[in-house]
Amino acid sequence: YEISACLVGSEMCIRDSTKTMGKGDKVVLYTSIPKNFKYDTPVIKIPTTSSVLKVSVNGKLVYTYGEDRYAENKLVGSGWHYIPVKKTDAGKNIRIIITSTEDATFSSIDAPVLMEYSDVFQQMMIKNRVPYVSAVSLILFGALIMALAGIMMIKRTGMSRLFWIGALSVTVGTWTACNYRLTQLFNIPLPVTTTLEYINLVLGALSVAMYFNCLLYTSP
């Protein structure tokens, strides 16, 4: 699917219908780099979901991600990419190719954004401050509850439910951090982030199951 210029809005429309990407499907975006940008260290921010990414400026490949992992049938991961742009690239044409590596990966694409590299993490924190604060709070609260429950379990029974509440809090917090890409602040690779996201979904469900299991067997 080829689309001229940056996408307007958030939905990817092909022939007036919304298209969900399948494995191997490609979207090609065409646009041009603004001629009069004033950034000292410009980058183009492009988010992807389980996709291979290729970026070319005036036909020259300047950035690629995930192609080797996709060829080896490995998890590619999801997250933000920051492609460096030279000041001499102003006004040049840019082509962005996004290749889905899984079925039903996404049905919308956020428009690429030209920005100053030094503002990347500040904007990331401002835009996602509520999820980030929630994630950190849940992780710290859960870890504290698990530690207290672990100590109390040595002296008395019936504290396992409290332990699993803490475990659920940690898993929800970690999943939130991964889902909102807080982990990219620490340069954690995208495949690792996505793997942690999946693992914590499973661990969260396990924590809920263990809580009700303890509730069942400790009920009078």
Where in this protein do the model-derived segments appear?
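Aromatic-lined ligand-binding clefts that engage carbohydrates, nucleic acids, or primary amines
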Residues: K38-V57
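Individual alpha-helical transmembrane segments in multi-pass integral membrane proteins
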Residues: Q123-S219
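Short, well-structured beta-strand segments within conserved domains
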Residues: V27, I33, D40-I46, D89-D103
